[in-house]
């Protein structure tokens, strides 16, 4: 699964922005990348919606400022206006497999769904 067309490139660029500590610390910047109907199943098993993710990142302060190492980023355009990305992350010794769906909207590409699954130890 790998496609590097313009839609996938844009989704990858935006995904990496969401993982940037400076972006994560800003509710406005995070909110600009999340679809109004965004939801996530986190590595903790918790279900998050757009409002709860923005609030959690804003309240995390320095905890959210640590570096997130990304590897194995791959993507494919499933249909016009819909991109699926898969990749792995490591942060503070925690590793997770990740999957994201990006949707093209009138305001640009927005993250619609995300799931993180911890690595088996």
Regions found by a protein language model. Give the residues of each.
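A beta-strand edge to alpha-helix "cap/lid" segment located at domain peripheries
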Residues: 1-32, 37-121
């Amino acid at each position: 699964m790998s496609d590097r067309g313009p839609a996938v490139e844009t989704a990858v660029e935006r995904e990496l922005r969401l993982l940037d500590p400076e972006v994560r610390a800003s509710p406005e910047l995070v909110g600009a990348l999340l679809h109004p109907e965004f939801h996530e199943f986190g590595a903790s098993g918790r279900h998050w919606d757009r409002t709860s993710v923005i609030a959690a990142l804003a309240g995390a302060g320095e905890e959210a400022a640590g570096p997130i190492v990304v590897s194995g980023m791959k993507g494919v355009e499933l249909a016009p206006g819909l991109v699926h990305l898969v990749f792995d992350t490591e942060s503070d010794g925690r590793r997770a497999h990740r999957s994201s769906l990006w949707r093209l909207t009138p305001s640009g590409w927005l993250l619609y769904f995300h799931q993180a699954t911890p690595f088996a130890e």
